[in-house]
């Protein structure tokens, strides 16, 4: 019963990290867009 659970956990963590990274990138993109708009 052991291994499958740990694999599930790893996948879950990976998914969460990817999700967080995506959100961070979008935040960064939004900030960059704002800066661009400010300079124009």
UniProtKB/Swiss-Prot annotation:
Localisation: Secreted
Keyword field: Amidation, Hormone, Pyrrolidone carboxylic acid, Secreted
A molecular-function term among this protein's GO annotations: hormone activity
Main location: secreted
Chain positions with Pyrrolidone carboxylic acid modification: 1
Listed SMART domains: CRF
One matching Pfam family: CRF
Record has Secreted as a keyword: yes
Residues modified as Isoleucine amide: 40
Domain of life: Eukaryota
Similarity section: Belongs to the sauvagine/corticotropin-releasing factor/urotensin I family.
Official protein name in the record: Sauvagin
Organism: Phyllomedusa sauvagei
Organism taxonomic ancestry: Eukaryota, Metazoa, Chordata, Craniata, Vertebrata
């Amino acid at each position: 019963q052991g291994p499958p659970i740990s694999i599930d956990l790893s996948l879950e963590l990976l998914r969460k990290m990817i999700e967080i990274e995506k959100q961070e990138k979008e935040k960064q993109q939004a900030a960059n867009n704002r800066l661009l708009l400010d300079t124009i």
